Amino acid sequence: MQIILLEKVANLGNLGDIVKVKDGYARNFLIPNRKARRATKDAIAEFEVRRAELEKIAAEKLAAAQAVGEKLSGQAFEITQKSGVDGRLFGSVTNGDVAELLKKAGYEVEKAQVRMPEGPLKMIGEHGVQVALHTDVVVDVTVNVIGDHA
C-alpha cells in the first residue's frame, strides 16, 4: 500500500515521504496512530496544503524532546529490588519499572521509550539504559539497582 507519512517514522521515512508498506502495517499501526494516510491524489493535495503546519508541529515536538533530553542525559537513578546474597535479583527490573522511576522523578516517559540493550536487569549494580524521547533524541541514563537482601 502506498502511504504518505504525516510525521517521521523510524526505519521508514520523514514527513511527507510517499512510501510503500505492507497493508497490515499501514491499516493496523500507521493510519490509526495518525502517522500516515493513504497516498491518494486528494490526500497528497491536502497534505501539501497542511505541510507547513505539520512541519511546525514536528519541529516543536523535536525541540521539546531535546529540552527534556538535555535535563535527563547522564542522570543516575536508584531502584531497590529484593536480591540474594550472590547479587542476583529475585525477578528483574524491566523497562516498565524504569519508566515508573522516571515518572516519579518528574519526566514523562512511557515504557516503550525505555530501551535496555541487554534486556531486563537481573543483577545489582549500575546499568546503562537508553531513553528514546523522539526518533532523533535518544539519551543515556544510569540505573543503579540496589539489592535488598531477603
From Swiss-Prot:
Record's keyword terms, sorted: Ribonucleoprotein, Ribosomal protein, RNA-binding, rRNA-binding
Pfam families named among the record's database cross-references: Ribosomal_L9_C (PF03948), Ribosomal_L9_N (PF01281)
PROSITE patterns membership: RIBOSOMAL_L9
Annotated Gene3D superfamilies: Ribosomal protein L9, C-terminal domain, Ribosomal protein L9, N-terminal domain
Cellular component GO terms held in the UniProt record: ribonucleoprotein complex; ribosome
Record-linked InterPro entries: Ribosomal_bL9, Ribosomal_bL9/RNase_H1_N, Ribosomal_bL9_bac/chp, Ribosomal_bL9_C, Ribosomal_bL9_C_sf, Ribosomal_bL9_N, Ribosomal_bL9_N_sf
GO molecular function: rRNA binding; structural constituent of ribosome
UniProt record, GO biological process: translation
Assigned protein family: Belongs to the bacterial ribosomal protein bL9 family.
HAMAP family: Ribosomal_bL9 (MF_00503)
Role noted for this protein: Binds to the 23S rRNA.
Protein name: Large ribosomal subunit protein bL9
